[in-house]
UniProtKB/Swiss-Prot annotation:
This is Small ribosomal subunit protein bS20. HAMAP family: Ribosomal_bS20. Disulfide bonds: none annotated. Belongs to the bacterial ribosomal protein bS20 family. Binds directly to 16S ribosomal RNA. One of its GO terms (molecular function) is small ribosomal subunit rRNA binding. NCBIfam families: S20. It comes from the Bacteria. InterPro entries: Ribosomal_bS20, Ribosomal_bS20_sf. The gene is rpsT. Keywords: Ribonucleoprotein, Ribosomal protein, RNA-binding, rRNA-binding. It comes from Prochlorococcus marinus (strain MIT 9312).
Length: 97
């Protein structure tokens, strides 16, 4: 256990940051899954409404990944890889229909 004031403060700050980072990572995963679900919906029923859903969910996922990279929750290469994988899937989904 920490003995001095600054060490106790660092423990408190580290815990706070861990929870914030956990929240960002969880939301990134959730938005990625929603984008994939919307791609599946579009494959089953290709119409303009589903296409808009795919595009808006892609934009939200990209935005949150960029914010996570900016706040050092994700490494920039990790963020780029995630965006690339999602984008390639969306491109193939939209191109096939």
């Amino acid at each position: 256990m920490a003995n001095n004031k600054s060490a106790k403060k660092r423990i408190k700050i580290a815990e706070r940051n861990r929870l914030i980072n956990k929240s960002y990572k969880s939301t990134v995963r959730t938005l990625t899954k929603k984008t994939l679900e919307n791609c599946e919906k579009y494959k089953k029923d290709p119409n303009d409404e589903n296409k808009d859903l795919v595009k808006t969910s892609l934009n939200k996922a990209f935005s949150l990944i960029d914010k996570a990279v900016k706040k050092n929750v994700l490494h920039k290469n990790n963020g780029a890889n995630r965006k690339s994988k999602i984008n390639n899937l969306v491109k193939t989904t939209l191109a096939t229909q």
